[in-house]
Amino acid sequence: MSGSTILCIDDEALGLEIRKAVLERSGYRVLTAVDGATGLSLFRRNTIDGVVLDYYMPEMDGGAVAEAMRRERPEIPIMLLSAYINLPSEVVALVDVTLLKGEGPQELLEKLRSMIGKTDGQAGSDGHAPGGSA
C-alpha cells in the first residue's frame, strides 16, 4: 500500500511527527493535523486512503472526528490511537482498528497495512462493518 495517503491527527506534536516520519519512511504520503477541525478540513479537501486518529484531544475528540468522517466518507478506514485501554464501545464501533499509544512502529505499520488493504464493505477488526449499528 505504499504511495497511499494517510491523514494523521493528534494534538501531541512530537507523537505526530514521529508517526509521520515512520510512515513516510515506509512509502506513505502523510498529511498531519494537530486538532480535529483541521483534520476534518484536510479529510474533506484531499484524497485519503486511511486515517490515524488520536482519541483524546481538546475541543473535538477522536470519537467526534470519526463520527463526522463516517457520515461523509464511510469507506475510508480509520485507526484510533489511545493511551486508554477501555474506550467507549460506541467509539470503537466507528473505527476499523484501535492501537494503544506507545506500541512500536512495527505494530502501527502492520495494523495500517491490514486496515487499508481491506476492500470496501469488509468487516472491521471486531467482525462488524465499521459504523454499522449493533
Per-segment meaning from a language model:
Residues T32-G50:
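Acidic, metal-coordinating helix/loop segments flanking the phosphotransfer/catalytic sites
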Residues M57:
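Receiver (REC) domain active-site loop signature in two-component systems and cognate sites
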Residues D35-T38, D61-V65:
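Acidic catalytic/metal-coordinating carboxylates
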Residues R44-N46, A68-E75, A93:
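Conserved phosphotransfer cores of two-component systems
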